[in-house]
Amino acid sequence: MTELSRVPVTALKGVGAALAEKLARVGLETLQDILFHLPLRYQDRTRVTAIGALRPGADAVVEGVVAGADVALGRRRSLLVRLQDGSGTLSLRFYHFSQAQKDGLKRGTHLRCYGEVRPGASGLEIYHPEYRALNGDEPIPVEQTLTPIYPTTEGLTQQRLRQLSQQALAMLGPSSLPDWLPAELARDYQLGPLDQAIRYLHRPPPDADIEELAEGRHWAQLRLAFEELLTHQLSLQRLREAVRSQAAPRLPAASRLPKRFLANLGFQPTGAQRRVGAEIAYDLAQDEPMLRLVQGDVGAGKTVVAALAALQAIEAGYQVALMAPTEILAEQHFLNFSKWLQPLDIEVAWLAGKLKGKARAAALERIGDGAPMVVGTHALFQDEVKFKRLALAIIDEQHRFGVQQRLALRQKGVDGRLCPHQLIMTATPIPRTLAMSAYADLDTSILDELPPGRTPVNTVLVADSRRIEVIERVRAACREGRQAYWVCTLIEESEELTCQAAETTYEELSSALGELRVGLIHGRMKPADKAVVMEAFKEGMLQLLVATTVIEVGVDVPNASLMIIENPERLGLAQLHQLRGRVGRGSAASHCVLLYHPPLSQIGRERLGIMRETSDGFVIAEKDLELRGPGEMLGTRQTGLLQFKVADLMRDADLLPAVRDAAQSLLAHWPQHVSPLLERWLRHGQQYGQV
C-alpha cells in the first residue's frame, strides 16, 4: 500500500484544485498531513438531551418538532424557531437566514440540532445551531464518537475537515503510515502504536475522558508529542554534526591584543567573564566551527567577553562581524568597540540600513578590503556584503534573528570554504526546558556574576491613580542630578497607536515638568533622529527620556537611576526585565516603578509580583515560559523554530529527558530511522539543517 505521505490531498473524494489550495494554507498537502492535523478540542454529540433537562452554558444535542417559525424584529432582525419535545420548549435563533431556510423550518418538521444553550428573553435559546431535518420513519443514529473540532482557515468548514479526516482514516494502517519508532524503544518508553493513537485522537469513543484530552495527558497525545520532540532533538543533533563536519579557521589563543585591551579597560574582568572567555578561546583554536551561546543576565558584561573573542580572531589575521537586531543597539556596540579597539590601532567599520550612497559604498569597500572589525545590523547579511577573511560572527540577541539570516552568514566564510565560528549572546536567559530543546545544537556558557559596582534595582507597583505622585518622584530624582526613563508600552499590537501615546505622554510630562529637559524616542522616528536623542540623553543634556520599548536592549546610561513603565501588564516578564536593566548601571540606588492600570488579571498580578520579588533573569525566564509559552519567548514568528504540531514545551517538559536519551539510542542503533522521521515532522524545515 502506498505511504500516505506520498498521496496528495487531491486523491480524496471532493478535493479539487480550489479546495487543495485552501488546505495548503494550513499546511495540508498530503493524506499524512491530514492525519497529523489533530483536533483542538471535542464536542460530545453522542447522546440526545431532553429539552426539559437543558442547562445554560452546556453544549447539547436536542431533537424535537418545530412548533412555529417567525421573523422577530428588534435591534437585529432574526428568525426565531420554537422547538418542542414533550419535556419543554426551546428557541433556535438565526441572525443570518434565507427565505429558503425559513421555508424549510415550517411547523411540524422534525429536527435534530446541536449548539450552546443560552438564557434568552423567552426561556432557553440556541444561537445558530447546526441542524438537520429527520425525515421518514428510519431513525438516524447519533454520533458514535466524540466530534472533533479542527484548527481551520477561511473557507474550510469543520464538516469538510471531518469528511476528509474520515476518508484518510479509512486508508490508515501500519503499511500506509509506518511507525518509525523501533519496537524496543516504544516498549522502553511505554509508547503505544502510532496508527491507534491517530485513530483515537480523530474519533475518540463516547466514554473518552474529555478533560484528559483537553490537558494533553492522554496516552495517544503523549505518543505523538514524544515522537515530535524526538524528531526535533534529532534535527538539532544532525545540525550539530553537519556543522562539526565543516572546516573552520583555526584561531590560536592570542596574548598581545587581549593584554593591551585589558590594561586599558580600567577594571578587572569577573571570574565568570574569565571562565567563559577561556571556553571561547579553546573553541576558536579548533578547526571545527564554534557554535556557542553566551547567556548573561542584564549587565553581566557579555560585550567584554565578545571583545576578547574578537581580538583572538583579529590577532590571527582574520575579520570579525558583530550583528545586533536594532540600529540603537548596533550603534552602541560600534561606539564601544571603537573606544576599545582604536587605541590598539584596529579599524572598526560600520554598516547599517540607513547608510546610503557614497558612505555605503565606502563601507562595503572597507569590508571587502579586510577591515578587521565590522559592526552592523542585519544589513551585514545582504548579498552585496563581501568579507575578505571572515572567521568569527558575533550575534547579539540571537532569537531576534531568523534561521535564514544565520544561513546567509554561514556562506560568507573565508573563500566560501571555511565556515565562520559563531558566538551568540543573549541577555534574555533561556530556561533549562528551552535550552534542552530549542538550543540543543549550541554549547552554552553562563555569565552568572555581575561586575562590581552594579546596584540592585528596587521595584515597586503603583496604580495609575497615583500618577501625579510618580511625576513628582521623577522631578525629585532629576533635581538630584539623576536621569529617568518613562516607558510607554504597546497598545493593541499597534506601533502607530503606541507612538501616538508616547507623543501625548511627552507633551503631558513636558508641561508638568516645565523646568526639566525632556526627550522623546519611538519606533517611527528616523534612525538618525533616534540616534541624536539617545546621544543627548547619554551626554546628560536631557534629564527625562519618554520612550517606547525601543530602548529595551543594550542602552547604557549609568546616570539613569529611575524608570517608570506604564501599563506593564501588557508586557511579558522577559521584556520587563530587559527594560528594568536600563537602570542600576551606576553606583546610585535605582528604582523601577510599574505604573499599572487596575484591575489586574490573575496572570497580570502574578507577573508583576514576580518582578517585584526577584531580579534574577533565570528565575524570571522560567516564570515567563510558564505564563507565555515557548513560541513568544523565542520570537518563533521569525525563527521557524518550535512551531510544534502536537507537542507543547511547557506541558510536555517532563518528556524531554527521556526524549534526549531516546535520540541518542536511535542515532546509535537505528540511524536509518532518522531521515524518515525528519521528513514526517519537519518536511518544510529541511533547510534548517544547514544553519
Question: Which residues make up each language-model segment?
Answer:
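N-terminal pre-Walker A segment at the start of P-loop NTPase domains
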Residues: F267-G277
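Upstream accessory/linker segments immediately N-terminal to the RecA-like ATPase cores of bacterial MutS
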Residues: A72-N264, T636, H669
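Short boundary/loop segments of OB/S1/cold-shock single-stranded nucleic-acid-binding domains
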Residues: L40-A60
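Structural detector for short beta-strands of small beta-barrel domains
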Residues: P56-R77, G115
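Long, highly charged, low-complexity intrinsically disordered interaction regions
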Residues: M1-L12, E21-A24, T231-H232, A242
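Inter-lobe coupling/hinge segments of SF2-like helicase ATPases
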Residues: R275-A278, P289-I610, D624, S665, ...
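C-terminal accessory region of SF2 helicases/translocases
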Residues: P599-V691
